[in-house]
Amino acid sequence: MISRTNTFQHIESYFSRRFLELADGNVVAYREVQPEKSNRVCVIIHGLTGTSYSMLLLADAYRKKGFQTIVVDLPGHGGSTPIPVEDMSSLARWLHVVLQEICPNHRLALLLGDSFGASVVLAYAQRYALLPTTSIILAAPIPLIHPVLSIADRFFSRVPDTIARQIYYTNHFLLSVRIRFLLAQWRRPDYRYYVAECIAIEGAQANHRYAEMVLMPANMRSNPFLSPLSEQLASQTVIMYGDTDRVAGLRAARYLRKWGNSAHIVQVPQCGHLIHIEGISDIIDASVSKQNH
């Protein structure tokens, strides 16, 4: 059993846990912190197998920069209600409604999507006009699904939630393998412990079958990274990925450089797929630079 670190407990104490009920009756869970005299809002969308909890280290870095920071739980994650999702436009509409509720005064300065969350953010940005002053960060995106990941997804989509949790979240041997796969700097004990803690905390909240059988297939059916990046959107976007991202792979990195050639592209050194842990300082630097541009 992984005990919670003082670091996470301390950071979590800054954030209020909130639940928003939408007009259709669905609930959206999110974490929020609002520093004094803050007039910039940063909204973060997490990845497929995580929740808002795993984004706390990154969210706290934005808090320290004076951002009102909101980390939203995707449908079926954390405390958010699962919703019917036909394709990524369904999630784009969902995010549009959520942002109208949590950012009613259009003060959104920064919208960041991590991993699968990057696909959600991109799908939203392609369909809804953002203010020119809003910056978009696509962190550790997965523009192309590696064949090995496709096989793994098909396998896990057929596994019951209880068994999937044992395999994916609580098996100690596989936990070690997963950490080495996700992190470039896996020898760092603090990084290993952070990842292990997130996996342990979030495993109990995982709606595995919904993620693998609803959300992932929706992304495969209507991958937003297959659509050209408009000139306006490119001017607002920073694409960031780790140089040792084994989840997306080198093929995805080459695709991103070609697809987003007019956007600001940052390859983070000594960083794997968990850029929200290993690449926090790089993300903050890119965000501040984009805001000041």
Enumerate the language-model features and the residues they cover:
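Acidic catalytic loop of the alpha/beta-hydrolase fold
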Residues: T244-A248, H273
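Catalytic histidine-centered segment of alpha/beta-hydrolase-like enzymes
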Residues: C271-S281
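Conserved alpha/beta-hydrolase catalytic His-Asp/Glu region
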Residues: P147, Y169-E231
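Short beta-strand/loop motif that positions the catalytic acidic residue
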Residues: L233, I239-Y241
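Alpha/beta-hydrolase fold catalytic core
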Residues: M1-C42, K64-F67, N292-H293
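Conserved HGGG/HGGXW glycine-rich cap/lid loop of the alpha/beta-hydrolase fold
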Residues: E32-G79
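Flexible "cap/lid" loop of the alpha/beta hydrolase fold
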Residues: Q126, I136-I167
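Active-site loop/oxyanion-hole signature of alpha/beta-hydrolase fold enzymes
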Residues: V71-L112, F116
